Structure formats: structure tokens, C-alpha cells
């Protein structure tokens, strides 16, 4: 059987064996597995199927396609891809809303703070390009559900918006494949409209909070000497997230334009 190490994975030491993926989660993954089984029972084709699971490993179905890593290709920077990721996220969010008994599971989100409000869905928690499988500009699947958990829709979409609108500012935009900044306000509006019923202001404010709290979380783990975060220490991810939060906060009013609520 053909084996292919998936070298870009940070934590689960994943490798492909034919049409399956073998992963070794570092924490109890019973919640995400139950969620994936719920998606399968609902007929969802956007998420991997759980084929085998134990405390030490899990075997999932492989979703063929291409994941996105910076610099993103022209296809993944397109409006078509932006619309597709918004609609795919809406589909899984709607299906997750009917997942009963989530209180029985321990979830492992990466962030240390959340906005005020009751959870609306079981979100993915890390909707970045490298966790989304594409066929051209269309989303073929959403993978790596280890950071899933109860949250609001805008909280999950905030990180997706950061990566796909994108909210990267300054010199950082070129490393993500952009020769010049796109019309972020228009792309944010397109993302929210394609998802349906999503408030751009909530998405931006949640993104600022998410980026800062992620940076704080990473800094705490790095300072604690957690070996799982050695790559993040070497690449200074904590500084990157906190700087991104500060830049986005300064750019907030420009991005949103006149206050739509008239305040």
C-alpha cells in the first residue's frame, strides 16, 4: 500500500495510506470523531469519514484535492474560491447545529478567550487554507477537526475571513500570494453575503479578538517549553498573531466603512 507522509501537519503526525489518512491526535478526539460521524449520517461529503479509531490513532477517509499554503495560488485567491469556502462553511455549520449531546465531550479549541454569547454551532475552529481541500476554486472538503468545539458562527468565520479576505496587512500580504492589496471591504461583503446573515462588523471584531488570543495562547505554550510548539517558537507565530491583531484593530474603521448601525 502506498504511504505518503503529510509533512505539513503540526500535531497529529498524519500520513496517507492509499485512500485513507492515519492520524495520531495528541488529545482526546472523541468529540471531533462523533461530529464527523454526525456529518456522515447527514449525508455530508465535505468532511472525512471515521473508518477506525482508538485512543492512539484514527483512520479517516482521504479527500482528494489540493490544500492551500502560502503563497496562495491565483485560483485560491479568486472570488470563486471565496464564495465556495463561505458556502461550504455555512453547510457544515448548519449540519453541526443538529449535533446533540455535545456537552458530553471534551473539546480542545486553541484559543483562550471567546466572545460573549451562547454557542450556536460546533465550529471547526481552524478554518485556514491548509485545512480546506480544493478542486480548482471549489471546496472539496474540510479536514483536521481537532480544534472543533461549541462556538458562534462569526467566531469560526472570523479566522476564515482573516485568511481568505484576507486581513493580512502590510508586507505580510505579499507572502500570501498577493502582488497588491485586494479590495478587502468588497471581499468581506462577498464572504458574508455568500455565507448568509453574517454581520461584517461581528466578523472583524471577532477576528481581532481571535488573533490576539491565539498569539497569547501560543506565547504561553512557548514560554512553558511545550515541545509541541517548537515550530511556532522558531517561526515566531506568537508575535505574528499579536501584530496582526494590532494592525487589524487600527484598520477596522477603514475596512468596515461608515457604521451601518448609525452609531
Give residue spans per PLM region.
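Conserved N-terminal boundary motif of the eukaryotic protein kinase catalytic domain
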Residues: 1-4
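Active-site acidic catalytic loop and adjacent metal/ATP-binding pocket
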Residues: 12-16, 50, 112-156, 166-168
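Active-site activation/catalytic loop segments of kinase-like enzymes and analogous catalytic loops
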Residues: 157-196, 211-222
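A conserved alpha-helical element in kinase catalytic cores
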Residues: 8-13, 18-95, 99
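Short, glycine/charge-rich beta-strand/loop segments that flank catalytic centers
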Residues: 52-56, 101-112
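ATP/Mg2+ or Mg2+-diphosphate-binding catalytic cores
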Residues: 214-263
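Conserved kinase catalytic-core helix
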Residues: 71-106, 119-125, 130, 134-135, ...
Amino acid at each position: 500500500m502506498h504511504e505518503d507522509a503529510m509533512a505539513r501537519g503540526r500535531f497529529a503526525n498524519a500520513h496517507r495510506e492509499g485512500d485513507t489518512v492515519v492520524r495520531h491526535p495528541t488529545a482526546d478526539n472523541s468529540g471531533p470523531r462523533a461530529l464527523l460521524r454526525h456529518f456522515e449520517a447527514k449525508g455530508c461529503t465535505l468532511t472525512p469519514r471515521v473508518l477506525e479509531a482508538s485512543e492512539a490513532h484514527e483512520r479517516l477517509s482521504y479527500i482528494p484535492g489540493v490544500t492551500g499554503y502560502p503563497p496562495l495560488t491565483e485560483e485560491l485567491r479568486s472570488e470563486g474560491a471565496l464564495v465556495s469556502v463561505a458556502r461550504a462553511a455555512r453547510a457544515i455549520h448548519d449540519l453541526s447545529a443538529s449535533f446533540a449531546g455535545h456537552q458530553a465531550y471534551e473539546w480542545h479549541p486553541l484559543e483562550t478567550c471567546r466572545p460573549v454569547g451562547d454557542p450556536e454551532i460546533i465550529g471547526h475552529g481552524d478554518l485556514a487554507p491548509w485545512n480546506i481541500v480544493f478542486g480548482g476554486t471549489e471546496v472539496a472538503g474540510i479536514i483536521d477537526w481537532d480544534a472543533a468545539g461549541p462556538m458562534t458562527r462569526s467566531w469560526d468565520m472570523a479566522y476564515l475571513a482573516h485568511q481568505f479576505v484576507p486581513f493580512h496587512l502590510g508586507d505580510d500580504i505579499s507572502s500570501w500570494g498577493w502582488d497588491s492589496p485586494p479590495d478587502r471591504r468588497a471581499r468581506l461583503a462577498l464572504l458574508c453575503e455568500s455565507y448568509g446573515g453574517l454581520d461584517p462588523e461581528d466578523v472583524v471584531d471577532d477576528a481581532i479578538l481571535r488573533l490576539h488570543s491565539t498569539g497569547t495562547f501560543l506565547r504561553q505554550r512557548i514560554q512553558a517549553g511545550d515541545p509541541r510548539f517548537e515550530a511556532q517558537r522558531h517561526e515566531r507565530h506568537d508575535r505574528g498573531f499579536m501584530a496582526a491583531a494590532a494592525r487589524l484593530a487600527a484598520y477596522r474603521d477603514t475596512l468596515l466603512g461608515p457604521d451601518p448601525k448609525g452609531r
